[in-house]
């Protein structure tokens, strides 16, 4: 046990690790006792524990440990931030970093090269500890599904969709993935993936409503840059002006809605916190959508960031608070490498009538990344 404590305190001594037999004693304890002990250790130390032995590595990646953490209330969500470099498509890669909002520190997750560079810009969503990559990116239709288990670190290929899709809208409703558009109008417009049965089925699509998905405004299927779910409906934000739609998962009816500036939505921070949709505009700040009046309203009490000093931002739900991340454009030489800072604010949101006020609970520097990296996606992952 002392050997594990040495590692946790970041003070391992090679000769102690080589000679100390305490790990054998620890391993000889009943399996449930070992799991209970490890479950009470912060996940930030698991990479160190994995280096102790193969048995430790197996334990910290086991689903039983994840379940034990959940039982004792240690399954706090962790934010996974995806960064993309700005190299040409063929040379690009995804790099993931983790942020524990309680510890305000980042740690590098083992980065992985995607199987196909076309998967780089495909939509991604999270359910529990797993991250799902769906379809293809711009100019490339793919039916593929990749599943990354953030607990075990494994990336595997899931069942393919019935249709190949380019930048479909993807959101999670009642534990299922709803995938919309990104294909021709004569193809299946909506597919639903059930993670439990690992099967795809055709989603409902009604001819009633303001617009039919895949017809009219959506003739060639939406090329969606962001999608979020709220109260059984999927809100799809498109690259095309006037093509932002709301899809009802119950009956397949669709209606259009406008973004805050009435234009196409390129990319930026979007998330749902406490059943409210939030977006970030450089020139408008943090906005929220009022579905009753069908209008966007500004979140009061927050200062706008200087658009000249930031690049792409990320937003994520952190236990009912709004996690807001951004990188600055200032380059710094750190340990001989050119890097830039990544900042995070934790915002408490309070609603009063038709107004929502935001209060910054804390704001801090949380890490550094190479200067050519951009925030591409923020996902809340639970264990």
UniProtKB/Swiss-Prot annotation:
Origin: domain of life: Eukaryota
SMART domains linked: FBOX, Kelch
Pfam families, alphabetized: F-box, Kelch_FKB95
Entry-linked Gene3D superfamilies: Kelch-type beta propeller
UniProt keyword annotations, A-Z: Kelch repeat, Repeat
Kelch repeats by residue range: 130-175, 176-220, 269-317
Domain F-box: 23-71
Stored PANTHER family: F-BOX/KELCH-REPEAT PROTEIN SKIP4, GALACTOSE OXIDASE_KELCH REPEAT SUPERFAMILY PROTEIN
This protein's name: F-box/kelch-repeat protein At2g22030
Organism: Arabidopsis thaliana (Mouse-ear cress)
């Amino acid at each position: 046990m002392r050997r594990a404590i040495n590692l946790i305190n970041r003070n391992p001594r090679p000769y102690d690790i080589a000679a100390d037999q305490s790990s054998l004693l620890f391993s000889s304890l009943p399996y449930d006792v070992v799991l209970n002990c490890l479950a009470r250790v912060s996940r930030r130390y698991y990479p160190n524990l994995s280096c102790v032995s193969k048995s430790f590595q197996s334990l910290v990646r086991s689903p039983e440990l994840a379940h034990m953490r959940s039982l004792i209330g240690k399954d706090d969500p962790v934010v996974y931030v995806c960064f993309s470099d700005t190299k040409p498509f063929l040379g690009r890669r995804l790099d993931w970093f983790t942020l524990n909002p309680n510890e305000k520190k980042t740690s590098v997750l083992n980065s992985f090269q995607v199987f196909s560079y076309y998967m780089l810009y495909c939509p991604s969503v999270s359910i529990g500890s797993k991250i799902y990559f769906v379809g293809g990116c711009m100019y490339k239709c793919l039916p593929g599904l990749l599943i990354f288990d953030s607990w075990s670190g494994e990336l595997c290929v899931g069942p393919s969709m019935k249709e190949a899709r380019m930048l479909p809208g993807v959101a999670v409703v009642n534990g299922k993935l709803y995938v919309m558009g990104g294909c021709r109008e004569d193809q299946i417009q909506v597919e639903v993936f059930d993670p439990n049965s690992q099967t795809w089925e055709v989603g409902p699509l009604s001819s009633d409503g303001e617009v039919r998905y895949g017809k009219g405004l959506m003739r060639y299927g939406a090329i969606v840059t962001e999608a979020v779910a709220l109260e059984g409906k999927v809100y799809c934000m498109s690259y095309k002006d006037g093509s932002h739609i709301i899809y009802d998962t119950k009956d397949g009816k669709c209606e259009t809605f406008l973004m805050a500036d009435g234009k196409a939505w390129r990319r930026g921070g979007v998330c749902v916190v406490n059943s409210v949709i939030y977006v970030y505009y450089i020139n408008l700040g943090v906005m929220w959508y009022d579905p009753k009046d069908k209008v966007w309203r500004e979140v009061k009490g927050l200062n706008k960031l200087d658009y000249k000093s930031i690049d792409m931002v990320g937003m994520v739900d952190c236990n009912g608070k709004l996690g807001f991340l951004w990188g600055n454009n200032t380059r710094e030489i750190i340990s001989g490498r050119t890097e830039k800072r990544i900042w995070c604010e934790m915002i408490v949101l309070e609603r009063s009538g038709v107004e929502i006020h935001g209060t910054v609970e804390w704001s801090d520097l949380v890490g550094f990344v190479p200067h050519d990296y951009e925030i591409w996606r923020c996902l809340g992952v639970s264990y």
